[in-house]
Amino acid sequence: MSTDPVQVLQPDGFNKSRWTQLPRDVLIGHQAIMQLPDIIADIKPGRSVLLISGGTTREVAGNTVADILKDQYEVRRFVAGKLDADTLEACSQASSSADFLIGVGGGRVIDCAKIVSYKQGKPFISVPTAASHDGIISGRATLPTETGSVSVGAHPPIAVVADTGIISQAPHRLMASGCADVISNYTAILDWELAHRLRGEQISEYAIALSKMTAEILVKDANLIKPGQEEAAWIVVKALVSSGVSMAIAGSSRPASGGEHKFGHALERLMPGAALHGEACGIGSIMTMYLHGGDWREIRSSLARIGAPTTPRELNIPDEVIVEALMKARDIRPERFTILDMGLTRESAEHLVQMLYEE
Protein backbone atom coordinates (compact mmCIF):
# COMPACT_ATOMS: atom_id res chain seq x y z
CA MET A 1 0.00 0.00 0.00
CA SER A 2 1.30 3.45 -0.91
CA THR A 3 2.16 5.75 1.96
CA ASP A 4 1.94 8.86 -0.23
CA PRO A 5 -0.43 11.49 1.13
CA VAL A 6 -3.87 11.57 -0.47
CA GLN A 7 -4.14 14.19 -3.23
CA VAL A 8 -7.37 16.15 -2.95
CA LEU A 9 -8.53 17.41 -6.35
CA GLN A 10 -9.65 21.01 -6.21
CA PRO A 11 -12.48 21.77 -8.65
CA ASP A 12 -12.22 24.84 -10.80
CA GLY A 13 -13.72 27.83 -9.07
CA PHE A 14 -17.14 29.06 -10.19
CA ASN A 15 -16.60 32.35 -11.99
CA LYS A 16 -19.83 33.13 -13.81
CA SER A 17 -21.43 36.52 -13.42
CA ARG A 18 -24.02 38.48 -15.36
CA TRP A 19 -25.38 41.98 -15.00
CA THR A 20 -29.07 41.90 -15.87
CA GLN A 21 -30.67 45.27 -16.53
CA LEU A 22 -34.45 45.41 -16.27
CA PRO A 23 -36.98 48.24 -16.01
CA ARG A 24 -37.64 49.22 -12.42
CA ASP A 25 -41.34 49.86 -13.00
CA VAL A 26 -43.71 48.46 -15.63
CA LEU A 27 -47.25 49.80 -15.75
CA ILE A 28 -49.72 48.36 -18.28
CA GLY A 29 -53.42 49.06 -18.47
CA HIS A 30 -56.37 51.35 -18.97
CA GLN A 31 -55.45 55.06 -18.65
CA ALA A 32 -51.99 54.06 -17.45
CA ILE A 33 -50.59 57.28 -18.90
CA MET A 34 -52.38 59.26 -16.17
CA GLN A 35 -50.27 57.46 -13.56
CA LEU A 36 -47.01 58.59 -15.15
CA PRO A 37 -46.42 61.26 -12.44
CA ASP A 38 -46.64 58.54 -9.77
CA ILE A 39 -44.07 56.44 -11.62
CA ILE A 40 -41.68 59.38 -11.94
CA ALA A 41 -42.15 60.30 -8.28
CA ASP A 42 -41.23 56.74 -7.32
CA ILE A 43 -38.11 56.70 -9.50
CA LYS A 44 -36.97 60.26 -8.63
CA PRO A 45 -34.89 60.81 -11.79
CA GLY A 46 -34.81 64.62 -11.44
CA ARG A 47 -36.90 67.67 -12.26
CA SER A 48 -36.01 68.37 -15.90
CA VAL A 49 -37.27 66.11 -18.69
CA LEU A 50 -36.92 66.01 -22.46
CA LEU A 51 -40.13 64.67 -23.96
CA ILE A 52 -39.44 62.96 -27.31
CA SER A 53 -42.30 62.17 -29.65
CA GLY A 54 -43.08 61.83 -33.34
CA GLY A 55 -45.20 64.16 -35.41
CA THR A 56 -48.28 61.96 -35.07
CA THR A 57 -47.65 60.59 -31.59
CA ARG A 58 -47.27 64.14 -30.27
CA GLU A 59 -50.99 64.54 -30.92
CA VAL A 60 -51.89 60.99 -29.83
CA ALA A 61 -50.18 61.07 -26.43
CA GLY A 62 -47.25 63.50 -26.34
CA ASN A 63 -49.39 66.54 -25.56
CA THR A 64 -51.19 64.63 -22.82
CA VAL A 65 -47.90 63.70 -21.17
CA ALA A 66 -46.68 67.29 -21.37
CA ASP A 67 -49.90 68.57 -19.79
CA ILE A 68 -49.85 66.18 -16.84
CA LEU A 69 -46.18 66.89 -16.09
CA LYS A 70 -45.90 70.64 -16.70
CA ASP A 71 -46.88 71.69 -13.15
CA GLN A 72 -44.28 69.49 -11.46
CA TYR A 73 -41.44 69.26 -13.96
CA GLU A 74 -39.51 71.40 -16.39
CA VAL A 75 -40.64 69.90 -19.70
CA ARG A 76 -38.84 70.44 -22.99
CA ARG A 77 -40.09 68.96 -26.27
CA PHE A 78 -38.32 67.29 -29.17
CA VAL A 79 -39.96 65.88 -32.29
CA ALA A 80 -38.05 62.99 -33.84
CA GLY A 81 -38.63 62.70 -37.57
CA LYS A 82 -36.69 60.01 -39.32
CA LEU A 83 -34.15 58.24 -37.12
CA ASP A 84 -30.70 59.13 -38.44
CA ALA A 85 -27.39 60.60 -37.26
CA ASP A 86 -28.64 64.19 -37.59
CA THR A 87 -31.75 63.48 -35.53
CA LEU A 88 -29.73 61.72 -32.82
CA GLU A 89 -27.27 64.62 -32.66
CA ALA A 90 -30.05 67.19 -32.43
CA CYS A 91 -31.79 65.14 -29.75
CA SER A 92 -28.55 64.81 -27.79
CA GLN A 93 -28.11 68.57 -27.81
CA ALA A 94 -31.71 69.13 -26.76
CA SER A 95 -31.30 66.70 -23.85
CA SER A 96 -28.01 68.12 -22.57
CA SER A 97 -29.68 69.94 -19.66
CA ALA A 98 -32.35 67.31 -18.98
CA ASP A 99 -32.19 64.94 -16.02
CA PHE A 100 -34.12 62.20 -17.82
CA LEU A 101 -35.89 61.47 -21.09
CA ILE A 102 -39.35 60.18 -21.98
CA GLY A 103 -40.00 58.55 -25.35
CA VAL A 104 -43.67 58.75 -26.37
CA GLY A 105 -44.37 56.97 -29.63
CA GLY A 106 -43.61 53.95 -31.75
CA GLY A 107 -40.40 52.08 -32.37
CA ARG A 108 -38.53 54.95 -34.00
CA VAL A 109 -39.21 57.35 -31.13
CA ILE A 110 -38.47 54.79 -28.43
CA ASP A 111 -35.20 53.86 -30.14
CA CYS A 112 -34.23 57.53 -30.39
CA ALA A 113 -34.79 58.01 -26.65
CA LYS A 114 -33.02 54.74 -25.93
CA ILE A 115 -29.88 55.58 -27.91
CA VAL A 116 -29.57 59.19 -26.72
CA SER A 117 -30.18 58.34 -23.06
CA TYR A 118 -27.63 55.54 -23.25
CA LYS A 119 -24.94 57.76 -24.78
CA GLN A 120 -25.56 60.45 -22.17
CA GLY A 121 -25.87 58.10 -19.24
CA LYS A 122 -29.35 59.31 -18.37
CA PRO A 123 -32.46 57.27 -17.57
CA PHE A 124 -35.41 57.18 -19.92
CA ILE A 125 -39.04 56.15 -19.65
CA SER A 126 -40.75 54.28 -22.47
CA VAL A 127 -44.34 55.29 -23.25
CA PRO A 128 -45.30 53.26 -26.34
CA THR A 129 -48.27 54.31 -28.44
CA ALA A 130 -48.24 51.08 -30.46
CA ALA A 131 -47.36 47.44 -29.78
CA SER A 132 -45.41 46.82 -32.98
CA HIS A 133 -42.29 45.05 -31.60
CA ASP A 134 -40.48 44.11 -28.39
CA GLY A 135 -38.18 47.14 -28.53
CA ILE A 136 -40.47 48.96 -26.09
CA ILE A 137 -38.60 47.30 -23.23
CA SER A 138 -35.41 45.76 -24.63
CA GLY A 139 -31.87 47.09 -24.31
CA ARG A 140 -31.26 47.14 -28.06
CA ALA A 141 -32.25 49.65 -30.72
CA THR A 142 -32.58 49.50 -34.48
CA LEU A 143 -30.73 52.21 -36.38
CA PRO A 144 -31.54 52.70 -40.07
CA THR A 145 -28.60 52.86 -42.47
CA GLU A 146 -28.18 53.47 -46.19
CA THR A 147 -28.22 49.71 -46.75
CA GLY A 148 -31.02 48.77 -44.37
CA SER A 149 -30.69 48.78 -40.60
CA VAL A 150 -28.36 47.68 -37.82
CA SER A 151 -29.04 46.57 -34.27
CA VAL A 152 -27.12 48.61 -31.70
CA GLY A 153 -26.63 48.14 -27.99
CA ALA A 154 -28.20 50.60 -25.56
CA HIS A 155 -29.94 50.11 -22.23
CA PRO A 156 -33.52 49.26 -21.31
CA PRO A 157 -35.88 51.94 -20.03
CA ILE A 158 -35.98 52.57 -16.31
CA ALA A 159 -39.77 52.38 -16.57
CA VAL A 160 -42.44 51.43 -19.09
CA VAL A 161 -45.91 52.98 -19.10
CA ALA A 162 -48.16 51.30 -21.66
CA ASP A 163 -51.66 52.71 -21.93
CA THR A 164 -53.80 49.98 -23.48
CA GLY A 165 -56.49 52.46 -24.50
CA ILE A 166 -54.03 54.45 -26.61
CA ILE A 167 -52.30 51.36 -28.00
CA SER A 168 -55.59 49.71 -29.00
CA GLN A 169 -56.40 52.70 -31.23
CA ALA A 170 -53.20 52.41 -33.25
CA PRO A 171 -53.52 50.76 -36.69
CA HIS A 172 -54.11 47.03 -36.22
CA ARG A 173 -51.26 46.30 -38.62
CA LEU A 174 -48.84 47.55 -35.95
CA MET A 175 -50.25 45.25 -33.27
CA ALA A 176 -50.28 42.29 -35.65
CA SER A 177 -46.63 43.01 -36.40
CA GLY A 178 -45.84 42.96 -32.67
CA CYS A 179 -47.58 39.60 -32.37
CA ALA A 180 -45.56 38.21 -35.27
CA ASP A 181 -42.36 39.46 -33.63
CA VAL A 182 -43.20 37.50 -30.46
CA ILE A 183 -44.40 34.37 -32.28
CA SER A 184 -41.08 34.27 -34.13
CA ASN A 185 -39.47 33.53 -30.74
CA TYR A 186 -40.28 29.88 -31.49
CA THR A 187 -37.65 29.68 -34.22
CA ALA A 188 -35.23 32.06 -32.51
CA ILE A 189 -34.80 29.65 -29.60
CA LEU A 190 -34.50 26.67 -31.97
CA ASP A 191 -31.64 28.49 -33.69
CA TRP A 192 -30.03 29.26 -30.34
CA GLU A 193 -30.22 25.62 -29.29
CA LEU A 194 -28.80 24.61 -32.69
CA ALA A 195 -25.85 26.96 -32.16
CA HIS A 196 -25.36 25.42 -28.72
CA ARG A 197 -25.22 21.89 -30.12
CA LEU A 198 -23.07 22.63 -33.16
CA ARG A 199 -20.95 25.59 -32.05
CA GLY A 200 -20.88 25.27 -28.28
CA GLU A 201 -22.62 28.61 -27.78
CA GLN A 202 -23.76 29.20 -24.21
CA ILE A 203 -27.51 29.21 -23.68
CA SER A 204 -29.78 30.32 -20.87
CA GLU A 205 -32.50 27.81 -20.05
CA TYR A 206 -34.41 30.46 -18.08
CA ALA A 207 -34.40 32.87 -21.02
CA ILE A 208 -35.43 30.11 -23.43
CA ALA A 209 -38.29 28.99 -21.17
CA LEU A 210 -39.64 32.53 -20.80
CA SER A 211 -39.33 33.29 -24.52
CA LYS A 212 -41.09 30.07 -25.50
CA MET A 213 -43.85 30.50 -22.93
CA THR A 214 -44.51 34.02 -24.20
CA ALA A 215 -44.93 32.80 -27.79
CA GLU A 216 -47.15 29.92 -26.65
CA ILE A 217 -49.50 32.20 -24.73
CA LEU A 218 -49.84 34.55 -27.69
CA VAL A 219 -50.62 31.64 -30.03
CA LYS A 220 -53.21 30.34 -27.55
CA ASP A 221 -54.88 33.77 -27.37
CA ALA A 222 -54.61 34.54 -31.10
CA ASN A 223 -58.40 34.64 -31.50
CA LEU A 224 -58.56 37.49 -28.97
CA ILE A 225 -56.28 39.79 -30.96
CA LYS A 226 -58.88 41.96 -32.67
CA PRO A 227 -58.69 45.53 -34.04
CA GLY A 228 -59.60 48.28 -31.59
CA GLN A 229 -59.92 45.95 -28.60
CA GLU A 230 -58.21 47.10 -25.40
CA GLU A 231 -58.03 43.50 -24.16
CA ALA A 232 -55.98 42.65 -27.25
CA ALA A 233 -53.56 45.47 -26.44
CA TRP A 234 -53.31 44.15 -22.87
CA ILE A 235 -52.38 40.65 -24.09
CA VAL A 236 -49.88 41.81 -26.70
CA VAL A 237 -48.08 44.37 -24.54
CA LYS A 238 -47.61 41.83 -21.76
CA ALA A 239 -46.14 39.43 -24.32
CA LEU A 240 -43.76 42.08 -25.65
CA VAL A 241 -42.63 42.88 -22.12
CA SER A 242 -42.00 39.20 -21.34
CA SER A 243 -40.04 38.80 -24.56
CA GLY A 244 -37.93 41.82 -23.65
CA VAL A 245 -37.27 40.40 -20.19
CA SER A 246 -36.08 37.12 -21.73
CA MET A 247 -33.47 39.08 -23.67
CA ALA A 248 -32.39 40.91 -20.53
CA ILE A 249 -31.94 37.58 -18.72
CA ALA A 250 -29.92 36.21 -21.63
CA GLY A 251 -27.79 39.32 -21.89
CA SER A 252 -28.44 39.34 -25.65
CA SER A 253 -31.29 39.27 -28.16
CA ARG A 254 -30.74 35.53 -28.78
CA PRO A 255 -34.01 34.25 -27.24
CA ALA A 256 -36.00 36.49 -29.59
CA SER A 257 -33.80 36.84 -32.66
CA GLY A 258 -32.61 34.04 -34.93
CA GLY A 259 -32.58 33.25 -38.62
CA GLU A 260 -36.02 34.80 -39.09
CA HIS A 261 -34.61 38.15 -37.91
CA LYS A 262 -31.54 37.84 -40.11
CA PHE A 263 -33.92 37.23 -43.01
CA GLY A 264 -35.95 40.27 -41.96
CA HIS A 265 -32.90 42.54 -41.91
CA ALA A 266 -31.80 41.20 -45.31
CA LEU A 267 -35.26 41.94 -46.70
CA GLU A 268 -35.09 45.47 -45.31
CA ARG A 269 -31.83 46.01 -47.17
CA LEU A 270 -33.32 44.75 -50.42
CA MET A 271 -36.68 46.54 -50.15
CA PRO A 272 -36.56 49.20 -47.41
CA GLY A 273 -39.97 49.84 -45.87
CA ALA A 274 -41.77 47.06 -47.74
CA ALA A 275 -42.61 45.20 -44.53
CA LEU A 276 -42.78 46.08 -40.86
CA HIS A 277 -40.11 44.46 -38.71
CA GLY A 278 -42.48 41.95 -37.12
CA GLU A 279 -44.18 41.14 -40.42
CA ALA A 280 -40.87 40.15 -42.00
CA CYS A 281 -39.89 38.10 -38.95
CA GLY A 282 -43.24 36.31 -38.96
CA ILE A 283 -42.87 35.20 -42.58
CA GLY A 284 -39.25 34.31 -41.88
CA SER A 285 -40.33 32.21 -38.92
CA ILE A 286 -42.70 30.13 -41.06
CA MET A 287 -39.83 29.27 -43.40
CA THR A 288 -37.20 28.61 -40.74
CA MET A 289 -39.62 26.45 -38.75
CA TYR A 290 -40.02 24.34 -41.89
CA LEU A 291 -36.24 23.97 -42.07
CA HIS A 292 -36.16 22.93 -38.41
CA GLY A 293 -38.77 20.26 -39.13
CA GLY A 294 -41.29 21.87 -36.79
CA ASP A 295 -44.97 22.72 -37.12
CA TRP A 296 -44.70 25.63 -39.54
CA ARG A 297 -48.40 25.41 -40.35
CA GLU A 298 -49.29 26.29 -36.75
CA ILE A 299 -47.18 29.43 -36.96
CA ARG A 300 -48.78 30.35 -40.28
CA SER A 301 -52.27 29.72 -38.92
CA SER A 302 -51.63 31.81 -35.80
CA LEU A 303 -50.29 34.72 -37.84
CA ALA A 304 -53.30 34.56 -40.16
CA ARG A 305 -55.77 34.57 -37.25
CA ILE A 306 -54.11 37.66 -35.83
CA GLY A 307 -54.15 39.41 -39.18
CA ALA A 308 -50.43 39.34 -39.91
CA PRO A 309 -49.22 38.55 -43.44
CA THR A 310 -48.06 35.03 -44.21
CA THR A 311 -46.99 35.44 -47.85
CA PRO A 312 -44.90 37.98 -49.79
CA ARG A 313 -47.89 38.65 -52.03
CA GLU A 314 -49.82 40.22 -49.16
CA LEU A 315 -47.02 42.80 -48.85
CA ASN A 316 -46.60 43.28 -52.60
CA ILE A 317 -43.10 41.85 -52.41
CA PRO A 318 -41.94 39.75 -55.40
CA ASP A 319 -41.15 36.14 -54.52
CA GLU A 320 -37.67 36.47 -56.00
CA VAL A 321 -36.86 39.21 -53.48
CA ILE A 322 -37.75 36.83 -50.64
CA VAL A 323 -35.47 34.20 -52.20
CA GLU A 324 -32.66 36.73 -52.38
CA ALA A 325 -33.23 37.76 -48.75
CA LEU A 326 -32.98 34.12 -47.67
CA MET A 327 -29.68 33.79 -49.53
CA LYS A 328 -28.26 37.01 -48.07
CA ALA A 329 -29.42 36.34 -44.50
CA ARG A 330 -26.16 34.53 -43.72
CA ASP A 331 -24.30 37.82 -44.27
CA ILE A 332 -26.29 39.54 -41.52
CA ARG A 333 -24.51 39.23 -38.17
CA PRO A 334 -22.38 36.29 -39.38
CA GLU A 335 -21.31 35.59 -35.79
CA ARG A 336 -24.92 34.59 -35.01
CA PHE A 337 -25.27 30.99 -36.20
CA THR A 338 -28.74 29.91 -37.35
CA ILE A 339 -30.40 27.32 -39.56
CA LEU A 340 -29.91 29.70 -42.51
CA ASP A 341 -26.14 29.38 -42.10
CA MET A 342 -26.10 25.67 -42.90
CA GLY A 343 -25.73 25.86 -46.66
CA LEU A 344 -29.18 26.81 -47.92
CA THR A 345 -29.21 26.51 -51.72
CA ARG A 346 -31.11 28.83 -54.04
CA GLU A 347 -33.27 25.92 -55.15
CA SER A 348 -34.20 25.21 -51.53
CA ALA A 349 -34.90 28.90 -50.94
CA GLU A 350 -37.25 28.94 -53.93
CA HIS A 351 -39.02 25.88 -52.52
CA LEU A 352 -39.43 27.63 -49.15
CA VAL A 353 -41.14 30.58 -50.78
CA GLN A 354 -43.53 28.36 -52.75
CA MET A 355 -44.29 26.46 -49.57
CA LEU A 356 -45.75 29.66 -48.10
CA TYR A 357 -48.62 29.44 -50.58
CA GLU A 358 -49.50 25.80 -49.89
CA GLU A 359 -53.00 25.13 -48.56
From Swiss-Prot:
CDD domains: Gro1PDH. Its main location: cytoplasm. The keyword RNA-binding does not apply. Binds 1 zinc ion per subunit. GO terms for cellular component: cytoplasm. It is an enzyme of class 1 (oxidoreductase). GO terms for biological process: glycerophospholipid metabolic process; phospholipid biosynthetic process. Substrate binds at residues 134, 181, 265. The keyword NAD applies. InterPro entries: G1P_dehydrogenase_arc, G1PDH, Glycerol_DH. Zn(2+) binds at residues 181, 261, 277. Pathway: Membrane lipid metabolism; glycerophospholipid metabolism. It is found in: Cytoplasm. It catalyses: sn-glycerol 1-phosphate + NAD(+) = dihydroxyacetone phosphate + NADH + H(+); sn-glycerol 1-phosphate + NADP(+) = dihydroxyacetone phosphate + NADPH + H(+). Its cofactor is Zn(2+). Keywords: Cytoplasm, Lipid biosynthesis, Lipid metabolism, Metal-binding, NAD, NADP, Oxidoreductase, Phospholipid biosynthesis, Phospholipid metabolism, Zinc. GO terms for molecular function: glycerol-1-phosphate dehydrogenase (NAD+) activity; glycerol-1-phosphate dehydrogenase (NADP+) activity; metal ion binding. NAD(+) binds at residues 107-111, 129-132, 138. Its EC number is 1.1.1.261. Catalyzes the NAD(P)H-dependent reduction of dihydroxyacetonephosphate (DHAP or glycerone phosphate) to glycerol 1-phosphate (G1P). The G1P thus generated is used as the glycerophosphate backbone of phospholipids in the cellular membranes of Archaea. Belongs to the glycerol-1-phosphate dehydrogenase family. This is Glycerol-1-phosphate dehydrogenase [NAD(P)+]. It comes from Methanospirillum hungatei JF-1 (strain ATCC 27890 / DSM 864 / NBRC 100397 / JF-1). The lineage of its organism: Archaea, Methanobacteriati, Methanobacteriota, Stenosarchaea group, Methanomicrobia. The gene is egsA.
